[in-house]
């Protein structure tokens, strides 16, 4: 069995190139296909190619980096075993690599980790320890155990050999198509982007390498703006595979030097990209797996790119099946094919008919209403559009010219997650209430902790929860606080769940507030 050679602390590009060429990743990983997306290529007037890392034995690229590092361990290190912390694809990569190398592995995963992920790691032969409420607590425990018991820590991204292992993907890309114009790569901790960029710039520097981040987890963008890695105050939950608060030090150094550009996208755009992948190549990508395609589509539109050969990395397909319901609901918005509007119309006979006639025959995709006032009615309406933002603006102008008050909710996350399912729940009298959105761990006892901390001191006047198949759920709750708001803030801090005050959200005022 080949052994990779150790790299220096901050290797230069040529040293990374040699490490990529020597990385013995194919003892565990596979060369994955580069496949043309015929339908999308025709639609976007470019040749769109997808690198199918979902075809790896662990259904993600993470196997490359994990094996590259672990294959280079000394016999003494292998005898002591390895440890890592992960709730996702890195855990499976380490477990699979350990089985191939005959090395004991311990994977520390947060207690809220979905059973499907825990079972997958165990299925590859890894020992699992469930510890902590989140990744940071799991990581702290893993590092503690590494120091106490002599395990070797296998980082998910910020290590030269992990980066070199991910760089083998770029070498395959160039061998499969040497005429690429641009390559789009997803970014979480930066290992894949760093490995791809440094390899391509050593061999074919004319190819542009563009990083893609989720808007709510853009740690690389924040680091580039600051000039050094920084901690994000919070990260999004939807594209959990790239939900990293801080870019790695070495990955940042390489990304800063070798990347050509960076772009961010929202969750709706990711959902639309997931649909594109399914319709074109029948791949069911996880959200972070479709991130690069979402960024590519946005980049093409922003820069009016035509006639180029563009590749993107489908980085993983470890999707929770129940999360696909959420994707299906949101992809129309991501494709700019649906407008969500709050419209005030007269509470009188014939007003619905007049409103629909003013839409000019456009298809209504959603219509939510409940009587609440004798004078005016507030309706939540979805309208199918075919020309994106321009048509949405045209509809709003038509409605305003027709005498209606209109608020565009198409980009309002709270409206899309919660309010659309709650229209008609306005209280009969004004309430002194504050509205908050929460992120709950999907684990036994989470709701009980919430109620023990907050529900016994203040009346809960509104509550909405819907599972989206991720490790965390989204909850919308309102409380009658009266004169006890300072005490409530203290209790929120004790609760420890991520939360945001939504009391001034227009969707709340239109449809739910007393």
Swiss-Prot record:
Which CDD domains does the record associate with it?
Answer: ACT_ThrD-I_1, ACT_ThrD-I_2, Thr-dehyd
Question: Does the keyword section mention Lyase?
Answer: yes
What's the short name of a Pfam family annotated to this entry? Answer: PALP
What positions belong to coiled-coil segments? Answer: none
Q: Where does pyridoxal 5'-phosphate bind?
A: 89, 188-192, 315
ACT-like domain location is 339-411, 434-504
The PTM N6-(pyridoxal phosphate)lysine maps to: 62
Q: Which gene encodes it?
A: ilvA
Offer one example of a GO biological process linked to this entry: isoleucine biosynthetic process
Per its UniProt record, the required cofactor names are:
pyridoxal 5'-phosphate
Q: Give the pathway.
A: Amino-acid biosynthesis; L-isoleucine biosynthesis; 2-oxobutanoate from L-threonine: step 1/1
Q: Which UniProt keywords apply?
A: Allosteric enzyme, Amino-acid biosynthesis, Branched-chain amino acid biosynthesis, Isoleucine biosynthesis, Lyase, Pyridoxal phosphate, Repeat
User: Reaction catalysed by this chain?
Assistant: L-threonine = 2-oxobutanoate + NH4(+)
| Protein name listed in UniProt | L-Threonine dehydratase biosynthetic IlvA
């Amino acid at each position: 069995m080949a052994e990779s050679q150790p790299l220096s602390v901050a290797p230069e590009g040529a040293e990374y190139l040699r490490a990529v060429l020597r990385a013995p990743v194919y003892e565990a990983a596979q060369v994955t296909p580069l496949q043309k997306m015929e339908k999308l290529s025709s639609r976007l007037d470019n040749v769109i190619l997808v690198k199918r890392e979902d075809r790896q034995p662990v259904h993600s690229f993470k196997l490359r980096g994990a094996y590259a590092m672990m294959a280079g361990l000394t016999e003494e290190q292998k005898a002591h075993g390895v440890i890592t912390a992960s709730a996702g694809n890195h855990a499976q990569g380490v477990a699979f690599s350990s089985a191939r190398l005959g090395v004991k592995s311990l994977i520390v995963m947060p207690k809220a980790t979905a059973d499907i992920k825990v079972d997958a790691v165990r299925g590859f032969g890894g020992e699992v320890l469930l510890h902590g409420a989140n990744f940071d607590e799991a990581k702290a425990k893993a590092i503690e155990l590494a120091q106490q018991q002599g395990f070797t820590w296998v980082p998910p991204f910020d290590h030269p050999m992990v980066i070199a292992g991910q760089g083998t993907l770029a070498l395959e890309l160039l061998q499969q198509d040497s005429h690429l114009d641009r390559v789009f790569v997803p970014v979480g901790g930066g290992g894949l982007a760093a490995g791809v960029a440094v390899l391509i710039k050593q061999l074919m520097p004319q190819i542009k390498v563009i990083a893609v981040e989720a808007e709510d987890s853009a740690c690389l963008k924040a680091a580039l703006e600051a000039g050094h890695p920084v901690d994000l105050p919070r990260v999004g939950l939807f594209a959990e595979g790239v939900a990293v608060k801080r870019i790695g030090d070495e990955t940042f150094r390489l990304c800063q030097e070798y990347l050509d550009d960076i772009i961010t996208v929202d969750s709706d755009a990711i959902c639309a990209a997931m649909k594109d992948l399914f319709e074109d190549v029948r791949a069911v990508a996880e959200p972070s797996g479709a991130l690069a395609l979402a960024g590519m589509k946005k980049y093409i539109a922003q820069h009016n790119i035509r006639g180029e050969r563009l590749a993107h990395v489908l980085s993983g397909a470890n999707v929770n099946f129940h999360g696909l319901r959420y994707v299906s609901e949101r992809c129309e918005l991501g494709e700019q094919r649906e407008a969500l509007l709050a419209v005030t119309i007269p509470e009188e006979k014939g007003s619905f008919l007049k409103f629909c006639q003013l839409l000019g025959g456009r298809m209504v995709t959603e219509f939510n209403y409940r009587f609440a006032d004798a004078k005016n009615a507030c309706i939540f309406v979805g309208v199918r559009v075919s020309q994106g933002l321009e048509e949405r603006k045209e509809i709003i102008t038509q409605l305003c010219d027709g005498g209606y008050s209109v608020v565009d909710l198409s980009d309002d996350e709270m409206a899309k997650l919660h309010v659309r399912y709650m229209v008609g729940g306005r209280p009969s009298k004004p309430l002194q209430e504050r509205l908050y959105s929460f992120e709950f761990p999907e684990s036994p006892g989470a709701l009980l902790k919430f109620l023990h901390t907050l529900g016994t001191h203040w009346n809960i006047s509104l509550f909405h929860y819907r599972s989206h198949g991720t490790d965390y759920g989204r909850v919308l709750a309102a409380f009658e606080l009266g004169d006890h708001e300072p005490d409530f803030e203290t209790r929120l801090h004790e609760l420890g769940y991520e939360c945001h005050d939504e009391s001034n959200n227009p969707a709340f005022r239109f449809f739910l507030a007393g």
